[in-house]
Amino acid sequence: MSETPYTATYYVLPAWNEEIALGKVLSDLRTVDPLGHIIVVDDASCDETIKAGESGGACVLPMVAQLGPWGAMQAGMRYAAEKGCWRVITMDADGQHLPSQIARLTDAMNQTDANVVIGACSERGSFLRKFAWNIMKLFSGISAEDLTSGFRLYDRRAIALLVGEEASYLEHQDMGVLARLLGNGMKVVEVDVEMHPRVSGTSRIFNSWPKVLWYMLQTLLLSVSKRRVERVNLEKYKAASAHD
């Protein structure tokens, strides 16, 4: 049976200087879903990320100016929404998120009727990242295990909330996005997944104390201003796949 626009899953991968890792990520993704709609959003890279994406068979959206992690993600989600997507899976292009774990996200959504599933790996991350997580959890009241994971599955209702103008003012795919989702009654669950260290490069945020402190200041201000919205516990869902 042919796939209609409203049964199609799109994969959105923001990429900034990821020419080294991107080819392997796309190859592994094609192995899992040979007919998948893959969108690589090149966030004004200085290397051959665009070429790597095109060589891997992805639809590459080149940004003329750097939008940042969430801006690039939202651009890809808007493109998918315009194409009539059913679901969107967001992944990093640096090799951390494994296509082999996608089934755990889809199983969790199918079994819980969640609007959003977060692929969580609480064991990952540097001291800086874990320090930031603990502070954000303390002030926001959100008990997610992995607040900053970009490995997520969104349904059409969640996508509609995140492609709007109000969501454009967010900086990162974590607290602000969760606040918007939870504040609009979306059901968000987590599922444990395996992750690998990034293949190359460093995090745009969690690579120095000044960047982490600036990120935390932005996030904490958002947490305080949205506190009544964010004081919701995410459901921790352990996927019990028959394939495990």
Q: What function would you assign to each model-found segment?
A:
Residues 8-10, 176:
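Cell-envelope/extracellular polymer assembly enzymes that use nucleotide-activated donors
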Residues 10-14, 62:
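Short hydrophobic beta-strand elements that form part
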Residues 17-31:
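Short, well-formed alpha-helical segments that are part of the catalytic scaffolds
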Residues 42-50, 95:
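A conserved acidic beta->alpha catalytic loop
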Residues 50-82:
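Conserved donor nucleotide-binding strand/loop of the catalytic core
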Residues 72-73, 77, 124-237:
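Conserved catalytic loops of nucleotide-sugar-dependent glycosyltransferases that act on lipid-linked
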Residues 85-96:
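Short beta-strand-to-loop acidic/aromatic patch adjacent to the donor-nucleotide binding site
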Residues 103-126:
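Conserved donor NDP-sugar-binding/catalytic core segment of glycosyltransferases
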